[in-house]
């Protein structure tokens, strides 16, 4: 028998090789539906479709919250004054936890529990006094509302932050079209009717907000709220965030920027313009001189064009209104701090323990005896109800959520501006959860991970591949 290559008739893999003792076995195709035997105790295999669906659950739950705080922000839990965003936020927590993509942030949990303990202590002290009874409903809402902010996603899902931003952009495109359409039909002479107020029972929607009002006193044209936003100011702030996010994405899509800008002007709201200015300044600082020069040039051209329109004249008239008592700017940026400072001056116990949950709004005779128009931002309202020491603990908790190891410092500073300055956000789930989505939900565990695993917003155009978490140092 001739030798096979490899020398001395030996098989290269070891041992002798004998043709006479080998034979070919027939090739048999596996039976249809055949599954390999499963080891004892091993989990049953999942169909591919179910596996793919399970992978989408975490992002789908986040998308649900985005839709709720934008297109459904006017809806309440039936029979209450609580936004539907509150229960949906807990659905998000369940969806993330079910796929193992949720993690409690130790620092946030500690600060939250400290704020809860201090708030309860202040409430007990105030309840024992002779002042008005605190609202335990308001206290309970405060404690429950901020529970989700103690959590963040794990690194595997954190890499999907660009996709979350892109989904937010698409939803806000709908809101922008609604704002432009709402203004266009009024300019065409068609009377505007709020279909929510007309056809929905008041037990399903908020009725306490100024949903629509004229662009100036006596005007037949109403400011645009996009039909679905609580107020024009809400619409303008959400649109300003969308505008800045679009600048941060690769592939600017100038049509989107134009639409967001037009919708922002249709709201005729100064808070959105102010928030847009904050975002542009932060981007200018972070991106350097060349980008800043282009941004200044573009801003100047747009400002000149807007100044030639009626909207420009209306916005110009509002630039100095913060010094005018009774104006919207004064009620938001000046009056709250004057009112709370005056209350502390008349009763020193307000500085230490506050007046009690909900009393800033209910005890008007004490806090606002002059009857000023006041729109309380989060911090002065919290000080008036729980005192300065507790407010400092709560402030540390919120700043940790909004600014610590967040995926985008620009969005973090914008979220802080919305929360602390531009809105009465303390008990507003829509605002609180928007800020959390843009910052703390996708924050890194440590500062080193932010630098080492920086989320690239350019990948929002093409969804990134899932990556394994970086090994611990």
Per-region residue spans from a language model:
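Long extracytoplasmic/lumenal interhelical loops at the membrane interface
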Residues: 314-386
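A membrane-periplasm/extracellular boundary helix in multi-pass inner-membrane enzymes
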Residues: 184-186, 284-324, 343-346
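Transmembrane alpha-helices of multi-pass inner-membrane enzymes
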Residues: 90-94, 412-421, 428-473
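Hydrophobic transmembrane alpha-helices and their immediate junctions
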Residues: 293-295, 382-420
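Helix-loop-helix junctions and helix-breaking kinks within/between transmembrane helices
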Residues: 73-84, 123-141, 229-237, 254-285, ...
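N-terminal signal-anchor transmembrane segment
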Residues: 29, 35-101, 117-126, 414-422, ...
